[in-house]
Design a protein with these regions (language model features):
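Glycine- and acidic
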Residues: 4-12, 201-202, 320-321
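Short catalytic-loop micro-motif centered on adjacent basic/acidic residues
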Residues: 112-115, 141-145
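Glycine-/small-residue-rich active-site loops that bind phosphorylated ligands and cofactors
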Residues: 15, 53, 148-149
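Class I S-adenosyl-L-methionine
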Residues: 131-140, 147-340, 344, 350, ...
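Conserved aromatic-histidine-acidic binding/catalytic patches
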Residues: 11-15, 56, 81, 85, ...
Length: 369
C-alpha cells in the first residue's frame, strides 16, 4: 500500500477534480448562508493533504481559503482547522499555505489552525470538550477525505452530527471496503467504520456494493440521527469501476437541497455520479432525452399528497423522508411538475410568497386534487 506522501497519490485525476468542484460549489453557498446569520463558522478538513497536487492544482485547504477570501463580505469570522498526520505532507501544507496567505486579502477574518495529528484524535478531543461543557458546535462543515477507510470511526461522525448546525462530507472508499470486507485482520477497522459489524447486517444477496453504501447511510440516519443524506458516485478516471462515494449528511433541509442541486448538476442528469471513461458518452446520449421529464415525479406527488394542501417548501422537504425513497429530483423539477398538474386540473395554487400567479416558491400553497 502506498504511503500518503507517495507522489502517485498526488496526481490530480479527474475524479479528484470533480470532488473538489463539488466541494467548492457547495462552500460558495454554505459560507454566505451560515456566515450572514452567525458570528463564526468553521471549516474542518480532517485529511488536509499536501496543499497542492503534482501538477500545481490546489488541494482542499487552498480551495476553501480562496472561496472564503472571495466571500468575506458574508461573514464576520471563519475558522479553519487543517489536520494532516503524514509529516512530509504536513510540512508541505505549511509551506503552501504560508505562501497562499501572502495574497489572501481577508486573512484578518480567518483563524487558521494546522494540526499534525490524526483526524480521529483532533476531532475526538474537540468533541470531548464540547460534550464536557454541554456546549454546541458553531455552524461547522467537516470535510473527511481519507485515502482509505481506516482512521474514520463512525462514532466521530455520530458525535459531530449531534450538534444541529454541523455537516459531514465524507469520502466513503467503496472499492477498498468491498475488496477487504472479508479479511479477518481488518474486521476491527470495518466495525469502527460502520459503528457495528457490517458483515452481519448486509443482505445475503443482491448488489453488495450498493448495500455497503446504503448500510453506511442507514447508520447515519438510524444511529447518528442525521435527517438528510445524499451520495455521489465517482469512478476511476480511466475506467468505469466505482472508486468511492461522496456522502453528505446534515440536519438542515436548506443545506441538503443546495447540495442535492450541486450534485445533480455535476453529474449526468439524474445519475448523481461521475462515470469515469463513460462520463462523456453518457452525457452525449442524455442529450437525446428531456431532462425536464417529470412524469415519475407527478406520480409520486399524487400518490403522496392527493387530497392535501402543503406549501411548496413542505412538498420538497416531505419527499426526502424516508431517506431511502427520496426521488432524484431538484427544485426546478418540482416546480415544473406542480405547474403541469395545475394545468391538467390535478392541483391548485394559492400565492403567498410569489407576487404573481405564475410564480411558485416558498410558502405558496399547493392543493393536490
Amino acid at each position: 500500500m502506498l504511503k500518503d506522501n507517495d507522489a502517485a497519490k498526488w496526481v490530480c485525476r479527474e475524479h479528484t477534480r470533480v470532488k473538489h468542484e463539488l466541494l467548492e460549489k457547495y462552500l460558495r453557498a454554505w459560507i454566505p448562508i451560515l456566515g450572514s446569520g452567525n458570528p463564526r463558522i468553521v471549516f474542518f478538513d480532517g485529511f488536509a493533504g499536501r496543499g497542492r497536487y503534482a501538477g500545481g492544482e490546489p488541494g482542499s485547504p487552498i480551495i476553501a481559503v480562496r472561496v472564503a477570501d472571495e466571500l468575506a463580505a458574508y461573514y464576520r469570522q471563519i475558522g479553519f482547522t487543517f489536520v494532516e498526520k503524514d509529516p512530509d505532507n504536513f510540512s508541505n501544507l505549511q509551506s503552501i499555505l504560508k505562501d497562499e496567505l501572502k495574497t489572501t486579502r481577508n486573512v484578518n477574518r480567518m483563524e487558521i489552525r494546522l494540526v499534525h495529528d490524526e483526524f480521529s484524535n483532533v476531532a475526538g478531543a474537540l468533541l470531548d470538550f464540547i460534550e464536557k461543557w454541554k456546549a454546541t458546535l458553531v455552524p461547522s462543515f467537516f470535510f473527511i477525505d481519507p485515502f482509505g477507510f481506516t482512521g474514520v470511526p463512525f462514532d466521530i461522525a455520530r458525535r459531530i452530527l449531534a450538534s444541529p448546525r454541523t455537516e459531514v462530507f465524507f469520502t466513503f472508499m467503496l472499492r477498498d471496503v468491498n475488496r477487504f470486507l472479508e479479511l479477518p485482520q481488518l474486521a476491527g477497522q470495518m466495525t469502527e467504520l460502520y459503528g457495528g459489524d457490517c458483515r452481519k447486517q448486509l443482505p445475503p444477496s443482491g448488489d453488495r456494493r450498493q448495500a455497503l453504501v446504503e448500510l453506511y447511510r442507514s447508520q447515519l440516519h438510524d444511529v447518528a440521527g442525521a435527517k438528510y443524506s445524499l451520495h455521489f458516485k465517482l469512478c476511476e478516471s480511466d475506467s468505469a469501476d466505482t472508486l468511492y462515494h461522496l456522502i453528505h449528511a446534515n440536519n438542515n433541509f436548506k443545506g441538503h437541497e443546495i447540495m442535492k442541486g450541486v450534485m445533480y448538476n455535476q453529474g449526468v442528469n439524474g445519475t448523481f455520479a461521475y462515470l469515469g471513461r463513460n462520463d462523456l458518452s453518457e452525457r452525449t446520449q442524455m442529450q437525446l432525452f428531456d431532462p425536464q421529464d417529470t412524469t415519475a415525479l407527478v406520480r409520486e406527488l399524487h400518490s403522496r399528497f392527493a387530497g392535501r394542501t402543503l406549501t411548496f417548501d413542505a412538498v420538497r422537504e416531505s419527499v426526502c423522508h424516508p431517506w431511502h425513497q427520496e426521488p432524484p429530483f431538484i427544485e426546478k423539477h418540482f416546480r415544473a411538475a406542480i405547474k403541469g398538474m395545475v394545468e391538467e386540473g390535478r392541483a391548485t395554487l394559492r400565492s403567498v410568497t410569489s407576487k404573481t400567479s405564475r410564480g411558485l416558491s416558498g410558502l405558496d400553497e399547493v392543493t393536490f386534487l
